[in-house]
Amino acid sequence: DDKLMIVKNCYQFLEGIEGMDYIANGDIAKLQKISRFEERYGLHFAEARISFPDYDDQEIVAKVILDTLDSESASLTYEQSNMLYQGVNEDYAHITAKKKRYEAVREDKYYNALQLKYANAITCHKSQGGQWKCVFIDNPFWQEELTVDDLKWLYTAITRATEKVY
C-alpha cells in the first residue's frame, strides 16, 4: 500500500461515496491497485483503485496523473496544465458552442485526473491542518535571529506532532 497525497482538489470519481463532497488537496490515500497505463496530451495516466484512511477506507476508482509523483513542482506545472487543457479541448472540437465545450472539458476524466504525490514524508506547508505521531524538522537555514514568518513556520511544524518532535 503506497501512501499518496492528493495535491489538487477534485470533484469527480465520488459516485456512491458517503461523507466526501470532494477529494481535497492534502487528503491522504492508499494505492490498492493500478492498471491501464497510457500516455495522452504529453502526460502519463493510469487507472487506480485508492482508499481514503480518513474516510473509513472507502475506495474509489479514478484516473490519475503519474507525472506529479516525482515532479519537483507542487502539482502540474502551468505548461503541463495548459497542454492538458488544450489537448482535452481538442477532443471536444466537434462541440461548436463555446460554453458547452468548456463544460465538456470540465467534466472530462483526463482533465480531472487526480494529481498525486508520495506521502511517506510531507512538507510543513502541506501538513497544515493534519497531525502525525512524529514530526521531523529539517531546516538547514537556521539563523541567529528568526523572522516572524520563520517563527510561524516553526510553530506550525511543532504543533503537527502528537507524540514526538525530532
Model-inferred region functions:
Residues 1-166:
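Core RecA-like ATPase module of SF1/SF2 helicases and allied nucleic-acid translocases
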